[in-house]
Amino acid sequence: MEALVLHEYARSGNCYKIRLTAAHVGAKLERCEYDIMAGETRTPKFLSRINGNGRIPVLQIGDRFLPESNAACWYLATGTDLIPQDRFDQADTLRWLFWEQYSHEPNVATLRFWFSWIGEENFNEFQRAALPLKRAAGLDALKLMDDHLAKRDYLVADRFGVADIVLYSYTSTCEEGGYRLADYPAVQAWLERVAAQPGHVPS
């Protein structure tokens, strides 16, 4: 495999999920840290060479750059047991990866960032206005996961896979955004199962 470099901000859950996937497949990552709060991903060099979208994580594969965390996780998991062989189960895995970025991360992860990085006392008018809707959408996402996991051990095909890795990252830290894991017993049990997997690494 070509050399892998993870351009990251280590505290980011999107970066952690790539490190976690790499750990499960035994891929060695070189890590390159950026201070997003200082604008290091908005420099002309970063924008022209690494990601014109000005965001991390970016997985560098040799001389090529792959933005978007779930794309990077899928790349690393390809050819391993983390992606099921069945065609429907593969599509269902993608469903969860898309859902995580569309319905889960924008709410659960955003509130973590707002409360843990910015601080409620520093919220601007937009953040204060958006907070109730973000919180409600995050509650809906966690309930959907809890209902789904009440009937099975893992998200797809009842076996551990890349969908579990991707959803583990921000779900495991949701209390930093004001959510209560105790309200979601099936999610709590699932988090414990994922963390008990061989190869698991903490954030």
Regions found by a protein language model. Name each.
Residues 71, 186, 199:
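Residue-level recognition of oxygen-bearing side chains
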Residues 85-88, 97-196:
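GST-like fold's C-terminal all-alpha helical module
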Residues 1-129:
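GST-like domain detector, emphasizing the conserved glutathione-binding G-site
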Residues 53, 79, 151-152, 197:
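Structured helix-beta-strand junction loops
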